[in-house]
Structure formats: C-alpha cells, structure tokens
C-alpha cells in the first residue's frame, strides 16, 4: 500500500487543526508550512518556519525507509507552491555518524557549512555548529537539543545530546544523523551559476532606468542602490535558490 497521504487545505489554521485531529486518533500527521514572505528571513519567526519545514522533510525521508503505516502531510496551497530540490539530493546530504566513524573536523566543518549550518564559537541556537579541538557541537533544526561529538584523534569516542544552558549531557546516542539546515543544497558550480544570474539580472534592471536620457528620480536612485546591494546580500545569506537552474 501507499506510505504517504497529502492533504491540501485553504489556510494554515485548518491545516494545523487537521494535524491535531489526526494525532487525537493516533494517526501520524505532520504540518508543512508555507514560507512567510514577510517574516521568512527574520531570525525568530523565520527560524521557526525553517525548522518546521525541515522536520517535515526529515520525517518524510525517515518514513520512506523505516516507517510503518501511512504518514499524512498537511499543507496549504502556498505550501505546495514552494520550489524545492529533489528529495534524493536532500537524502544524499544527510551525514550519519556512529562509533565506527572517523572525522576530520575541518572537512566536516566545510560539509556543514554547505548544508546551511553557521559556525560559531559556542552553539546557542538551531542551525549552528562549533568546533573546539576534538569536540564538535551541532544543533540541527530537526532536534530539540544539540549534540556533542567527542573525538579520540579522528575516531568518534562519544555522541551525546546536551543542554544548551547547563552544557550537561542529556542522553548518550549510538548514532546520529545530521540533516541539512537549509532546504536548498547546491554544488559549487550551481552556486557560481546562481551568482552569475543574479549579476546579469541586476544589470538588466539597472538598464531599465535609462540613466543617460533622463534625470533619475529619488525612487529610481533608491531602487538602483538596492539592486547593487543584492549581490552582496545573496553572497552573505546564501539565498541562491531563486536564481539557480535546479
């Protein structure tokens, strides 16, 4: 039989209620939210949406290999309209570690950055990781607490969930799967292509102002300045997805 059921509702409130109703009847259901055009890039609300979307994607991936019964995904019209990378690419990006794994911290750091994680001195929030000698802390959007991996040389010696505030261990794990901290995973060539497309689009838009034939208005000057900042903003945030061919 089938493993998934997709239900599309007219708005978020109905979608969330449907998930709650399904849980009441012991049916596995998860809500997949749409991006909020206004708040998606804001730290607090944007991270919440990102977390929900990534948790849903990870549940779908896990269910395909280990789940029994039917997983119901509930979303809205806006939710199914969002463009995503193929699920196979998302699966390929997942890193699974256990006590037989060997890790070179800086190579892992490069992979984590490509997966959307932000390197910090100390992990405080989801989407961050930190490396201090042979200690690697990772806080995935799909987890409720960060994970600390301790190395003996390059071998995994300990995998534990820990509390952010107290730094105390919560639970010892036998293995740990690191899911991407972004919905968009690109190769280096795709990123370069995306940046090139952004620059081309910026130049085309600036030409529309026809600077040589008429005096620019205040609004045109402001728009031009904003366009010139676009490339720098994209490089800073990694928001290439709209401009890539994937």
Annotate each PLM feature.
Residues 1-246:
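ASCE RecA-like P-loop NTPase motor cores
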